[in-house]
C-alpha cells in the first residue's frame, strides 16, 4: 500500500519520509499556501528527495497549491517574512487552519492517486487544535465520506519529541543539513560580511533568530547529536 507523506522541507517530515520509505512505496506531497519561506522550502524538498535514503521507493513529488493570501493578511508575519522572536512560545506562532488546508488538499490528491494513507509529522506536545488525535480522526472521517473512499490520516511521531525524531533520523541516515526549520531563511549572498564562513554548497541558511531555529538547535542538543545547521547569527543560540 502506498503512503502519502506531507513533506514540508522540515526535519520532522524528512525523517518521516525516510521512515515510511523503509516500509513501502512513499509519495511525497508538498502543499504551498503562499507563506514567505516557501521558495526556500521547495528548494530544500527537491534537494532532500534527490539525496535522501529512500530505498528507491519514493514516487515523484506531488507539488500542490492552495492560495491562502486572501485569508492571511499581507501584513501577517508569515506572509511578510517577519517571524516572531527567538523566545516566542509555540502558541503564538499558530497559523489558523493550516493543517485543515494541507490535509484537505493532500486528501483530494490521494483520492485521485488511489492512495489510502496520508501521514503528517506532528510531534508530541503540539499545542494547536488542528494537531490533536481527535482532529485527525474527525478529519479522516469527513474526508473519507466526502471523497467516497477510505483515507487513514496518521501522525506516527505524535508521541515523540523532536529530539527523538532526530535520533531516529540519524539511525536512518537522514542528512539533516538538507532540511529546513526556519521562518526567515536566507541565501548566502544576503548575509553580512561579519557572518561565519559558509560552505559554498549551502543554498539556504537558517536565520538563527526565530522560534523554529531555537526549537531545532535545542532539539539537537537534547538528542546529543551534532547540529549540522548553518545559522546566519548565533547570538541567541544557547
Predicted ranges, named:
Residues 1-173, 191, 198, 202-204:
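ATP-dependent adenylation/nucleotidyltransferase module used to activate substrates
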Residues 12-14, 125, 212-215, 228:
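Short, electropositive, low-hydrophobicity segments enriched in small/polar residues
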Residues 71-72, 77-79, 182, 220, ...:
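Short clusters of hydrophobic/aromatic residues that line enzyme substrate/ligand-binding pockets
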Residues 104, 178-187, 205-218:
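Local cysteine-cluster metal-coordination motifs and their immediate loop/turn environment
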Residues 216-226:
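Hydrophobic/basic alpha-helical segments enriched in Actinobacteria
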Residues 224-235:
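Short cysteine/histidine-rich metal-coordination sites, predominantly Zn2+-binding motifs
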Residues 238:
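Iron-sulfur (Fe-S) cluster-binding modules
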Amino acid at each position: 500500500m502506498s503512503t502519502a507523506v506531507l513533506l514540508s522541507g522540515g526535519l520532522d517530515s524528512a525523517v518521516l519520509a525516510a521512515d515510511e520509505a523503509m516500509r513501502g512505496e512513499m509519495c511525497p506531497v508538498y502543499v504551498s499556501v503562499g507563506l514567505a519561506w516557501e521558495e526556500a522550502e521547495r528548494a530544500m524538498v527537491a534537494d532532500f528527495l534527490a539525496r535522501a535514503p529512500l530505498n528507491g521507493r519514493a514516487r515523484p513529488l506531488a507539488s500542490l497549491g492552495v492560495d491562502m493570501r486572501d485569508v492571511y493578511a499581507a501584513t501577517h508575519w508569515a506572509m511578510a517574512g517577519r517571524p516572531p522572536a527567538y523566545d516566542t512560545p509555540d502558541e503564538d506562532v499558530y497559523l489558523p487552519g493550516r493543517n485543515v488546508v494541507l490535509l484537505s488538499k493532500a486528501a483530494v490528491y490521494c483520492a485521485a492517486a488511489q492512495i489510502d494513507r496520508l501521514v503528517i509529522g506532528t510531534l508530541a506536545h503540539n499545542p494547536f487544535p488542528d494537531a490533536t488525535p481527535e482532529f485527525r480522526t474527525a478529519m479522516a472521517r469527513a474526508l473519507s465520506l466526502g471523497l467516497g473512499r477510505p483515507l487513514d490520516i496518521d501522525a506516527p511521531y505524535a508521541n515523540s519529541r523532536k529530539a527523538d525524531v532526530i535520533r531516529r533520523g540519524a539511525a536512518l541516515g537522514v542528512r539533516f543539513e538538507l532540511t529546513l526549520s526556519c521562518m526567515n531563511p536566507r541565501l548566502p549572498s544576503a548575509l553580512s560580511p561579519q557572518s561565519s564562513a559558509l560552505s559554498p554548497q549551502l543554498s539556504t541558511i537558517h536565520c538563527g533568530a526565530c522560534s523554529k531555529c531555537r526549537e531545532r538547535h535545542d532539539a539537537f542538543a537534547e538528542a546529543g547529536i551534532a547540529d549540522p545547521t548553518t545559522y546566519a547569527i548565533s547570538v541567541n543560540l544557547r
